[in-house]
Amino acid sequence: MVHLTGEEKAAVTALWGKVNVDEVGGEALGRLLVVYPWTQRFFESFGDLSSPDAVMNNPKVKAHGKKVLGAFSDGLAHLDNLKGTFAQLSELHCDKLHVDPENFRLLGNVLVCVLAHHFGKEFTPQVQAAYQKVVAGVANALAHKYH
Protein backbone atom coordinates (compact mmCIF):
# COMPACT_ATOMS: atom_id res chain seq x y z
CA MET A 1 0.00 0.00 0.00
CA VAL A 2 1.24 3.44 -0.92
CA HIS A 3 0.12 6.36 1.22
CA LEU A 4 -0.37 9.34 -1.06
CA THR A 5 -2.16 12.56 -0.27
CA GLY A 6 -5.01 13.50 -2.57
CA GLU A 7 -2.75 16.05 -4.19
CA GLU A 8 0.02 13.48 -4.76
CA LYS A 9 -2.39 10.94 -6.22
CA ALA A 10 -3.81 13.58 -8.57
CA ALA A 11 -0.30 14.57 -9.69
CA VAL A 12 0.70 10.95 -10.35
CA THR A 13 -2.50 10.22 -12.25
CA ALA A 14 -2.36 13.44 -14.30
CA LEU A 15 1.22 12.90 -15.40
CA TRP A 16 0.72 9.18 -16.08
CA GLY A 17 -2.11 10.05 -18.45
CA LYS A 18 0.47 11.79 -20.65
CA VAL A 19 3.05 8.97 -20.61
CA ASN A 20 3.77 7.18 -23.87
CA VAL A 21 4.09 3.68 -22.40
CA ASP A 22 5.79 2.28 -25.52
CA GLU A 23 8.51 4.92 -25.53
CA VAL A 24 9.05 5.35 -21.79
CA GLY A 25 8.94 1.62 -21.08
CA GLY A 26 11.62 0.80 -23.62
CA GLU A 27 13.78 3.69 -22.51
CA ALA A 28 13.48 2.82 -18.82
CA LEU A 29 14.32 -0.86 -19.29
CA GLY A 30 17.09 0.01 -21.73
CA ARG A 31 18.64 2.46 -19.29
CA LEU A 32 18.45 -0.13 -16.52
CA LEU A 33 20.40 -2.58 -18.69
CA VAL A 34 23.00 0.04 -19.66
CA VAL A 35 23.48 1.69 -16.26
CA TYR A 36 23.39 -1.60 -14.33
CA PRO A 37 24.86 -4.06 -16.85
CA TRP A 38 24.68 -7.03 -14.47
CA THR A 39 20.91 -6.95 -14.96
CA GLN A 40 21.45 -8.06 -18.56
CA ARG A 41 21.89 -11.66 -17.39
CA PHE A 42 18.11 -11.93 -17.06
CA PHE A 43 17.67 -10.95 -20.70
CA GLU A 44 20.17 -13.16 -22.54
CA SER A 45 17.42 -14.29 -24.94
CA PHE A 46 16.99 -10.69 -26.14
CA GLY A 47 19.94 -10.90 -28.54
CA ASP A 48 22.45 -8.09 -28.97
CA LEU A 49 23.03 -6.19 -25.74
CA SER A 50 26.70 -5.54 -26.49
CA SER A 51 26.65 -1.74 -26.37
CA PRO A 52 24.42 1.07 -25.12
CA ASP A 53 23.19 1.69 -28.68
CA ALA A 54 22.44 -2.01 -29.18
CA VAL A 55 20.47 -2.12 -25.93
CA MET A 56 18.52 1.09 -26.52
CA ASN A 57 17.57 0.05 -30.08
CA ASN A 58 16.81 -3.61 -29.28
CA PRO A 59 13.17 -4.35 -30.20
CA LYS A 60 12.89 -7.03 -27.50
CA VAL A 61 14.03 -4.55 -24.85
CA LYS A 62 11.45 -2.04 -26.10
CA ALA A 63 8.67 -4.66 -26.16
CA HIS A 64 9.46 -5.91 -22.66
CA GLY A 65 9.71 -2.34 -21.38
CA LYS A 66 6.21 -1.72 -22.72
CA LYS A 67 5.02 -4.85 -20.90
CA VAL A 68 6.69 -3.72 -17.66
CA LEU A 69 5.02 -0.31 -17.82
CA GLY A 70 1.70 -1.98 -18.57
CA ALA A 71 2.03 -3.81 -15.26
CA PHE A 72 3.07 -0.54 -13.59
CA SER A 73 -0.11 1.07 -14.97
CA ASP A 74 -2.13 -1.72 -13.34
CA GLY A 75 -0.40 -0.89 -10.07
CA LEU A 76 -1.35 2.77 -10.38
CA ALA A 77 -4.98 1.68 -10.65
CA HIS A 78 -4.65 -0.37 -7.44
CA LEU A 79 -2.43 1.67 -5.14
CA ASP A 80 -4.36 0.38 -2.12
CA ASN A 81 -3.52 -3.24 -2.98
CA LEU A 82 -0.10 -3.34 -4.62
CA LYS A 83 0.87 -6.64 -3.00
CA GLY A 84 -2.24 -8.29 -4.39
CA THR A 85 -1.82 -6.65 -7.78
CA PHE A 86 1.78 -7.82 -8.11
CA ALA A 87 1.48 -11.19 -6.30
CA GLN A 88 1.81 -13.31 -9.44
CA LEU A 89 4.66 -11.22 -10.84
CA SER A 90 6.42 -11.40 -7.48
CA GLU A 91 6.12 -15.17 -7.47
CA LEU A 92 7.34 -15.44 -11.07
CA HIS A 93 10.37 -13.22 -10.49
CA CYS A 94 11.24 -14.95 -7.21
CA ASP A 95 10.58 -18.63 -7.87
CA LYS A 96 11.17 -19.00 -11.59
CA LEU A 97 13.35 -16.14 -12.77
CA HIS A 98 15.37 -15.69 -9.55
CA VAL A 99 15.64 -11.93 -10.02
CA ASP A 100 17.39 -10.06 -7.23
CA PRO A 101 14.62 -7.90 -5.71
CA GLU A 102 17.02 -4.95 -5.55
CA ASN A 103 16.56 -4.72 -9.32
CA PHE A 104 12.95 -3.61 -8.80
CA ARG A 105 14.16 -0.62 -6.80
CA LEU A 106 16.76 0.18 -9.45
CA LEU A 107 14.18 0.05 -12.24
CA GLY A 108 11.85 2.29 -10.26
CA ASN A 109 14.56 4.88 -9.84
CA VAL A 110 15.45 4.68 -13.53
CA LEU A 111 11.78 5.16 -14.39
CA VAL A 112 11.72 8.33 -12.29
CA CYS A 113 14.78 9.61 -14.19
CA VAL A 114 13.15 8.86 -17.53
CA LEU A 115 9.94 10.61 -16.50
CA ALA A 116 11.96 13.65 -15.40
CA HIS A 117 13.73 13.67 -18.76
CA HIS A 118 10.48 13.41 -20.73
CA PHE A 119 8.46 15.92 -18.72
CA GLY A 120 11.09 18.49 -17.73
CA LYS A 121 9.70 21.37 -15.67
CA GLU A 122 6.34 19.60 -15.39
CA PHE A 123 8.12 16.93 -13.31
CA THR A 124 8.39 19.14 -10.25
CA PRO A 125 10.04 18.07 -6.99
CA GLN A 126 6.54 17.44 -5.60
CA VAL A 127 5.66 15.16 -8.53
CA GLN A 128 8.99 13.38 -8.14
CA ALA A 129 8.35 12.84 -4.42
CA ALA A 130 4.98 11.27 -5.23
CA TYR A 131 6.48 9.03 -7.91
CA GLN A 132 9.30 7.98 -5.56
CA LYS A 133 6.63 6.77 -3.13
CA VAL A 134 4.86 4.86 -5.90
CA VAL A 135 7.96 3.16 -7.31
CA ALA A 136 9.07 2.23 -3.78
CA GLY A 137 5.65 0.71 -3.13
CA VAL A 138 5.73 -1.23 -6.39
CA ALA A 139 9.27 -2.48 -5.70
CA ASN A 140 8.20 -3.57 -2.23
CA ALA A 141 5.17 -5.40 -3.65
CA LEU A 142 7.29 -7.16 -6.27
CA ALA A 143 9.75 -8.21 -3.56
CA HIS A 144 6.97 -9.47 -1.26
CA LYS A 145 7.36 -13.15 -2.25
CA TYR A 146 11.03 -12.98 -1.25
CA HIS A 147 10.16 -12.29 2.41
Swiss-Prot record:
GO biological process: hydrogen peroxide catabolic process
Annotated positions of the S-nitrosocysteine modification: 94
Residue ranges occupied by any Globin domain in the UniProt entry: 3-147
ATP-binding keyword on record: no
Modified residues (Phosphoserine): 45
Entry GO CC: blood microparticle; haptoglobin-hemoglobin complex; hemoglobin complex
Expressing tissues: Red blood cells.
Modified residues (N6-acetyllysine): 60, 83, 145
A Pfam family of this chain: Globin
UniProt GO molecular function: haptoglobin binding; heme binding; hemoglobin alpha binding; metal ion binding; organic acid binding; oxygen binding; oxygen carrier activity; peroxidase activity
Phosphothreonine modified-residue sites: 13
Domain of life, per lineage: Eukaryota
Subunit structure: Heterotetramer of two alpha chains and two beta chains.
PANTHER family: HEMOGLOBIN FAMILY MEMBER (PTHR11442), HEMOGLOBIN SUBUNIT BETA (PTHR11442:SF42)
Protein family membership: Belongs to the globin family.
Protein function: Involved in oxygen transport from the lung to the various peripheral tissues.
Protein name per UniProt: Hemoglobin subunit beta
